[in-house]
Amino acid sequence: MVSWIICKAVVLVFGMLYPAYFSYKAVRTKNVKEYVRWMMYWIVFALYTVTEAIADLTLSWFPLYYELKIAFVVWLLSPYTRGASLLYRKFLHPLLSSKEKEIDDYIVQAKEKGYETMVHFGKQGLNLAANAAVTAAVKGQGAITERLRSFSMHDLTAVQGDETSENRPFATFPDGQKKARASVSDSSGFGSLRKDSGDDNTDEDVEVNSEDEVYTQKGLRRSQSMRSVKVIKGRKEIRYASLKHKPKKRPQLYFREDTAHHL
């Protein structure tokens, strides 16, 4: 682990930062000799980076592997050995010169195929995204319909009943109390009818001796009958066949001459 950390630090500092600074100076001073030297170094270092990535996966178990990497970077960079210039002139330049045309063709084909591949995979990605969105929408709609079907009509009526009971301004009576009240009102109306009929019978039996008493009794009888009619109209009318009453004809009143003379 310590060897890996030291190796990584040496490669970053001496293999990248130091050459980058001197490459800047070569470009600024327009020194062609130094410019060519550092260009050859960067070509060799790029090849070294690719080889290092493969070797770290396959040869990292080898003894003194990281120490050998440090020594190789120093050998490439040292002005005394000039390892980068040596590798480039002896191996890389002849190889690249012989394979230059093939490499250019591969690059052009890679660009064309890369564009077509990108468009193809882009279309597939859009189709997959659209299908996923439609599937999610259909599943969501199906879940909502199943949820609505799970409710029975009894549950819906119960919910409506709860809402109407909450919105009522006053409490309602149950059906039993309504029937009891209706029976009480009917019985009271029936009692008033019997009372009125009894009053009529007693009025018929009484003999009237004066015209003033006749008018006063008629007014009382009319007021009682009107009150009974109002009570019956305000409540539920119930007809009873056995309670039909036929009023008797009142006897005609004859006034004597003596009483008229006194009046």
Swiss-Prot record:
Regions of biased composition (Basic residues) lie at 242-251
Stretches the record annotates as Disordered: 161-228, 240-263
Q: Where in the cell is it found?
A: Endoplasmic reticulum membrane
A GO cellular component term found in this entry reads:
endoplasmic reticulum membrane
Q: Can you tell me which residues the record assigns to a coiled coil?
A: none
Write out the similarity annotation.
Answer: Belongs to the DP1 family.
Name of the protein described by the UniProt record? Receptor expression-enhancing protein 3-A
